């Protein structure tokens, strides 16, 4: 939904019914069949002397957006897109920490608190206690708990195609699945391909007018909406937040 364009037209006096949007008008109420998660990108890897405790001061230099069919998929897509070398809600430094130290850490509200929170959930710590310590909405904590539950399923079922398919639908990367199955990323990729577990591209269509909108996101659920053409194409490569 082109918020900026619609807002500008409203500002010059146009009514919603007069503003065309994707084959309809801006008066049509948007209907969503996807979820979006945004994660801030903090540059503490470049500014190593900066304090990474978060507060009211702006410290992020950008953000990433993960689009998916479920909250878990959005979380994991976003984490991978941060370009911090992390491919999952997992950091070894937190895996090595005692539980009481993790509880102390999550009350300090740092840029990587979400990874410490995930480690506590991975250890079966109470979501209610974690919520009380961080005030993170339980909806998000429960999504992380489902990610941790899928980790357990994968560990208990190495090379299992059903588990692999379920993990991909939840947003797991081949690289992290490989680490749980003590193999390499390419082996997981080949296993997926051999069993027809490949992503589709779904359309971001909020108005459902039937018009094709070339705004797509990948997912392992649903039907493919991408239309291939013979037109010339370009790839725009972005750098990082700095």
At which residue positions do the language-model features occur?
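Non-catalytic terminal/interface segments that mediate subunit docking, oligomerization
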Residues: 189-242
């Amino acid at each position: 939904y082109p918020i900026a364009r619609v807002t500008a037209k409203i500002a010059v006096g146009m009514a919603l019914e007069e503003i065309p949007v994707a084959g309809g008008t801006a008066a049509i109420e948007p209907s969503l069949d996807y979820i979006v998660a945004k994660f801030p990108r903090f540059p503490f890897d470049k500014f190593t002397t900066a304090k990474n405790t978060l507060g009211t001061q702006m410290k992020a230099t950008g953000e990433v957006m993960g689009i998916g069919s479920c909250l878990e998929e959005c979380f994991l897509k976003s984490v991978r897109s941060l370009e911090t070398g992390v491919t999952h809600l997992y950091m070894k430094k937190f895996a090595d920490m005692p539980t009481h130290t993790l509880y102390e850490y999550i009350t300090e509200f740092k840029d990587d608190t979400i990874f410490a929170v995930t480690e506590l959930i991975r250890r079966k710590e109470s979501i209610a206690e974690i919520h009380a310590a961080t005030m993170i909405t339980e909806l998000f904590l429960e999504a992380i708990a489902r990610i941790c539950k899928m980790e357990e399923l994968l560990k208990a079922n190495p090379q299992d195609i059903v588990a692999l398919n379920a993990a991909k639908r939840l947003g797991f990367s081949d690289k992290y699945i490989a680490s749980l199955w003590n193999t390499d990323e390419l082996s997981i990729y080949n296993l997926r391909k051999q069993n027809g577990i490949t992503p589709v591209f779904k359309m971001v269509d909020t108005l459902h007018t039937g018009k094709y909108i070339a705004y797509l996101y990948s997912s392992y659920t649903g039907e493919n909406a991408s239309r291939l053409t013979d037109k010339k194409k370009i790839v725009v490569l972005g750098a990082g937040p700095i």
